[in-house]
Structures are given as structure tokens and as C-alpha cells.
Amino acid sequence: MKKFFTEAFEKMNAADRESFYRTVFMNDTSEYAQRKRNEYYKSVLRRMGKNVNIGVGVKIENPELITIGDNVKICDGATLIARPESEIFVGNNTVINDRVYLDTEQKDGYIHVGDSVYIGTGTTLFGHKGLEIGDHVLMAQNITLTPYSHIFEDPTANIITQGGHSKCVTIGRDAYIGMRVTIMYSGDIGEGSVIGAGSVVVKPIPPYSVAVGNPARVIRRRGKENEDS
């Protein structure tokens, strides 16, 4: 089997080789397919570090705009989309879990993920004007982050035509974002903060805060008693 694939590959032009990789190796769980995926991605990504593991069914658009650090794991079914003139950077020792969706969304957007970050299954992250995730951030499952807010003030115009506002959103180092949290436009998360499961963040959260609810509000500082007591 290996000889057959090697001989067939050597006869292909560049476009056919890319199609061949996508068809044959992207959804194959064998160790050989894993090695071939790594070879392919190393040749097309802006940079791919050492000891990177890219799972089956991963979708990467515009790989020349994407940098992957050392010891990174991108799990099955993840999607990384870098729009033209944007970029995605993933730091060292980071895990992007199953079915995570990263999309810069627009040409001047970007997503920068720091070192030793864990992004949980089913999380969706957009980077319209920039998304910066600090080192050692822990993100649980099914989080949604979109640094964009629709304009809807004109009742005579369709909302879909009114555009919106976008800004860079930052998540400080060592923050913990609970499962099913939604982070909206202006929802910066301070260093060392904890956001409780199911919360909706619509305004900045100060460093070392514990915040919960919809909308999320600070209930205490880490290391201090409950602010309501």
C-alpha cells in the first residue's frame, strides 16, 4: 500500500498532490497517514514547529497565513480559517480540541493563541479585529467568542445591511473560561480571572476576578471573600 501511494504521488503535479493528500490522508487514522499529513502541513503552513499532531478531518484554509508552534495538538475535526491578509498564530504546547472552530472572519483580523493554552471541544473563536489569548489560558467546552456587535438602530433598514462594530478582544494569561460561556464585543478578560459556566461576558472583567451570570458580573476577587457578604 505504501509503495502504491508513493509511486502515484510522484507522478502528480502540485494541484493534484494537494487534492491527493486531502482525499487519502486527511481522514485516515493510521500512523502512516498521520506522518503524511504532517509532511503536507509542514510544506504549506507559514511555520510548523516540532512534534505537532494534526488529527483527522482537520480543515485549514490559507495555511500560508498560519503559524503553529512546537508540541501543538490539533484534534479531530478542528477548523482554522485565516482570511486573506489576516493571520492565525498558535503558540507552543497548546491543545486545540475536537471540533474547535477558529476564524479570523475578515482580512484585517487575527487570532493569537499563546503558549500552553487548552481550548475545549466545540469552542468557536472569531478574530474580526483581533483576538489575543494569553499563555496558560484554560478554555472549557462549547465556548463562543465573537469580537463583533451588529448595528440595528435604523428600523427602516434591514439589520443585515447595517454592518457592525468590532474590536480586539484579549484574554489575559492564566484565565479560566467555563463551559458554554459567551464572550461578546468589549468582553476583555483580565489576567488570572475565572468566568463561571454559562456566563455571558459583555464588558471587561478585571484581573483575578471571579465573574458569573448573564450578564457576567464580578462576585469576588480570587483569594478574597464574596463581595456580597
Task: Explain the meaning of each model-derived region.
Residues 188-212:
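C-terminal/domain-terminus segments
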Residues 1-51, 136, 142-143, 149-156, ...:
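Terminal amphipathic alpha-helical/low-complexity segments used for targeting or macromolecular assembly
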Residues 59-68, 74-187, 214, 222-229:
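Flexible, glycine/small-residue-enriched loop-and-beta-strand segment within the central core
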Residues 47, 53-64:
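Long amphipathic N-terminal alpha/beta scaffold segment
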Residues 183, 201-203, 218:
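Basic, gly/Ser/Thr/Pro-rich low-complexity segments located predominantly at protein N termini
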Residues 22, 33-34, 53-55, 75-76, ...:
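A short, structure-level motif marking secondary-structure boundaries and short turns
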